[in-house]
Amino acid sequence: MILTVTMNPSIDISYPLDELKIDTVNRVVDVTKTAGGKGLNVTRVLSEFGDSVLATGLVGGKLGEFLVEHIDNQVKKDFFSIKGETRNCIAILHGDNQTEVLEKGPEVLEQEGQEFLEHFKKLLESVEVVAISGSLPAGLPVDYYASLVELANQAGKHVVLDCSGAALQAVLESPHKPTVIKPNNEELSQLLGREVSEDLDELKEVLQEPLFAGIEWIIVSLGANGTFAKHGDTFYKVDIPRIQVVNPVGSGDSTVAGISSGLLHKESDAELLIKANVLGMLNAQEKMTGHVNMANYQALYDQLIVKEV
């Protein structure tokens, strides 16, 4: 089983409009509300793929109750309740544009943070892989993910970590390393304080920087150009076919689902990388975020090429 962790989930509200009118009333006919957050996108894709998944994280208030109720019934759920209210994230879709209004979210009390660590520790007993995704809510220390990774490592579980900025930096600088990280070029540049290109020789050098020591897998998304990956001392380039992109949002989360599934099933390097890329591409072909049409899985799978470089 795979445990997904979403520390700062949201109710994602979509308002489609033909035109967004400023300083006046905009009436919305069709409103969509879903359980949102990067980890919950991972959860949905794993469930649609057919893997057993357990979702956890922090929820609070009536919106927190709404969120848990709107997660697929096939998914096992064991969230931790806090006093603060789960946030809303609003997307206004007007014409070809998207305007977002994102709430900061609740501030987590220090005691709640400590109690969640105990909650997390108990959940580790029933899973093999942990996928931690997204931002930390206010109130938790910047190295909180390092604490989760430490507990998972002590329990002998694989950890896939998908976060960025100070939270990722804190994990990289700690002695407690995840199994997998999934930065893109922009995030690599931010971590190293210099521009990083998509040149394969440069990426090889970058991924051997001391900052990344001790991490088994580093998987770098190159968008339409595929993926570059380092597993131990071996480097791979994944070539992907051109596809018709409908909505790329959530493709990174779908990739995390594929990585987690590959670890769960002890797949070969090539199998893991292909599965991860295919699920990311399938998400990009759908209007709904964090959704894949498995009917198209094998056709895409057969088109991907993994090369050792």
Curated annotation (Swiss-Prot):
GO terms for molecular function: ATP binding; phosphofructokinase activity; tagatose-6-phosphate kinase activity. It catalyses: D-tagatofuranose 6-phosphate + ATP = D-tagatofuranose 1,6-bisphosphate + ADP + H(+). Pathway: Carbohydrate metabolism; D-tagatose 6-phosphate degradation; D-glyceraldehyde 3-phosphate and glycerone phosphate from D-tagatose 6-phosphate: step 1/2. Keywords: ATP-binding, Kinase, Lactose metabolism, Nucleotide-binding, Transferase. InterPro entries: Carboh/pur_kinase_PfkB_CS, LacC, PfkB_dom, Ribokinase-like, Tagatose/fructose_Pkinase. GO terms for cellular component: cytosol. Its EC number is 2.7.1.144. It holds the Pfam family PfkB. CDD domains: FruK_PfkB_like. One of its GO terms (biological process) is lactose catabolic process via tagatose-6-phosphate. Belongs to the carbohydrate kinase PfkB family. LacC subfamily. This is Tagatose-6-phosphate kinase. The lineage of its organism: Bacteria, Bacillati, Bacillota, Bacilli, Lactobacillales.
